[in-house]
A protein has these predicted regions:
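A composition-driven surface/loop motif
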Residues: 1-28, 32-232
Length: 232
């Protein structure tokens, strides 16, 4: 029986450069090249792996099919979640590959994931403060939303550096349903902060998903580039 493997990301290499790995053996770890953000992708079974990459010591863990995603929440790897989700106000839903923000925050999300293994949602009725700091997310599965507010959520969203979010089919890039409210601006002290948002097929850039009305969206500052998907 073939052993099931899962994707794990390892950042910190020269963009577009070759990466030589010493281990883990037997899992297609030759001819590895970092992407444009200096990230490599390894496909491995569940377990903990220690190896070197371009002479650098690395350790990663894949547990229950979930490995490092390259995205952090308040400096913690999103996939592993906080030690105490209740007090931290967030957790990672491994089934839907979604960071669920259920507290007031503030939350800062950073990193790069373009393989659809990280989305973000603010849960129903929560008032929260969220900052995107050089965050790039691409939703790849039909119905995946890069950043969604659930019903009656109220969010103050700040962006620092350059962030770029793209949702998949039938979802808005940043989904704000009827009854939810989103206020957007650049982070204090970052006058050049920029956010790019793209909806999937049938979805708005910011607002409602397929054939759905949107809630209240207020833009207070910063550079914001928004595009709906085809027929959105």
């Amino acid at each position: 029986t073939a052993e099931q493997v899962f994707c794990a990301t390892v950042p910190g290499f020269s963009p577009g450069g070759p990466v030589v790995l010493d281990g883990p053996a037997g899992y297609g770890t030759t001819d590895i090249v970092a992407d444009e953000h200096g990230i490599i992708y390894l496909w491995l079974p569940n377990g903990t792996y220690t190896f070197t990459a371009n002479g650098r010591d690395c350790t990663l863990t894949i547990q229950d099919g979930v490995g490092p995603t390259g995205v952090t929440v308040n400096d913690e790897e999103a996939a592993y979640g906080p030690a105490d989700p209740l007090s931290a106000g967030w957790r990672f839903d491994t089934t839907n590959r979604t960071v669920l923000l259920s507290g007031q925050g503030p939350f800062t999300l950073s990193g790069y994931n373009v393989i659809g293994t990280v989305c973000i949602a603010v849960t129903n009725g929560v008032t929260s403060t969220v900052t995107f700091s050089n965050l790039t997310l691409r939703a790849t599965g039909s119905g995946q939303c890069a950043f969604a507010l659930e019903t009656n959520a109220v969010v103050s969203l700040y962006f620092a550096g350059e962030s770029d979010l793209t949702s998949a089919k039938y979802r808005a890039g940043v989904e704000v349903p009827t009854g939810a409210s989103l206020a957007i601006t650049n982070a204090p002290g970052d006058d050049v902060g920029a956010l790019t948002v793209t909806g999937g097929y049938g979805g708005a850039g910011i607002g409602g998903g397929y054939d759905a009305n949107g809630g209240v969206v207020t833009v207070n500052g910063g550079t914001l580039t928004v595009a709906g998907g085809f027929a959105g």
